[in-house]
């Protein structure tokens, strides 16, 4: 696994796990804002642009990041955040290692498995993968994701560099992710975020996570869509993160 690193090695460590189909630039602005006060590490998830291997499973990605933390930071870091697929990987890490971090920010992580979505992914992407690499189609898709315009070039370039197989595998993995019983043993302070305008499945996932993690805090973000918090509202996101860790 490849990593982008910002900040000073002597500072507390924050790890940012990007969303599926994106890459390290998902958190670029956040990392730039925080680098004077923390060491920021952004793993490039397997199968994504800039990675060094194909995507296999959410568990494999979680295992690799846990090993990285063990090797470099003594088994625990200050805070880990994750968006969507990155949020699922974070939940998997917390399920395996209850004290992998002191604080966690989980944004829009689906935990309601859907066999229908799983079944549809392969035939749909089999037919439209060629379109995804067309700039006009990519612009339409980008607008539907409601990301801020300045991220389009990164999005288009990285979407074109992803293989069809990697897209299919990570989407299928994400569609079937579910809460592990061991997640309830987690001792990290967990903050859950979901946009008010997200799908019913995503809103239900956030509430189910909140029920499972009795001491967690659930934030339903007014007017926001999927990924809007970390990608489109950097100032608010950084303010929230700093407020969480200020008592460290």
Regions found by a protein language model. Name each.
Residues 224-236:
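Catalytic histidine-centered segment of alpha/beta-hydrolase-like enzymes
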Residues 199-205:
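Conserved alpha/beta-hydrolase "acid-adjacent" motif
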Residues 95, 101-131:
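Flexible "cap/lid" loop of the alpha/beta hydrolase fold
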Residues 4-50:
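Conserved HGGG/HGGXW glycine-rich cap/lid loop of the alpha/beta-hydrolase fold
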Residues 41-81:
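Active-site loop/oxyanion-hole signature of alpha/beta-hydrolase fold enzymes
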Residues 186, 192-194:
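Short beta-strand/loop motif that positions the catalytic acidic residue
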Residues 82-86, 90:
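Gly/Ala-rich beta-loop-alpha elbow adjacent to hydrolase catalytic centers
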Residues 116-117, 131-184:
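Conserved alpha/beta-hydrolase catalytic His-Asp/Glu region
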């Amino acid at each position: 696994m490849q990593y982008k690193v910002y900040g000073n090695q002597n500072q507390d460590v924050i790890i940012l796990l990007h969303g599926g189909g994106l890459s390290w630039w998902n958190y670029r602005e956040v990392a730039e804002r925080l680098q004077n006060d923390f060491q920021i590490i952004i793993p490039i998830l397997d199968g994504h642009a800039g990675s060094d291997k194909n995507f296999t499973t959410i568990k494999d990605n979680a295992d690799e990041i846990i090993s990285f933390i063990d090797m470099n930071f003594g088994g625990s870091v200050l805070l880990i955040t994750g968006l969507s697929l990155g949020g699922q990987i974070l939940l998997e890490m917390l399920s395996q290692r209850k004290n992998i971090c002191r604080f966690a920010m989980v944004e829009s992580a689906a935990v309601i498995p859907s066999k229908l979505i799983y079944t549809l992914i392969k035939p749909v992407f089999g037919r439209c993968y060629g379109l995804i690499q067309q700039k006009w189609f990519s612009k339409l898709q980008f607008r539907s994701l409601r990301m801020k315009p300045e991220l389009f070039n990164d999005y288009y370039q990285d979407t074109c560099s992803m293989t069809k197989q990697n897209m299919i595998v990570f989407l299928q993995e994400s569609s079937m992710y579910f809460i592990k019983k061991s997640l309830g043993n987690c001792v990290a302070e967990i903050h859950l975020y979901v946009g008010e305008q997200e799908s019913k499945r995503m809103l239900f996932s956030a509430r189910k996570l909140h029920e499972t993690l009795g001491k967690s805090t659930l934030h339903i973000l007014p007017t926001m869509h999927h990924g809007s918090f970390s990608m489109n509202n950097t100032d608010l996101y950084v303010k929230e993160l700093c407020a969480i860790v200020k008592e460290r």
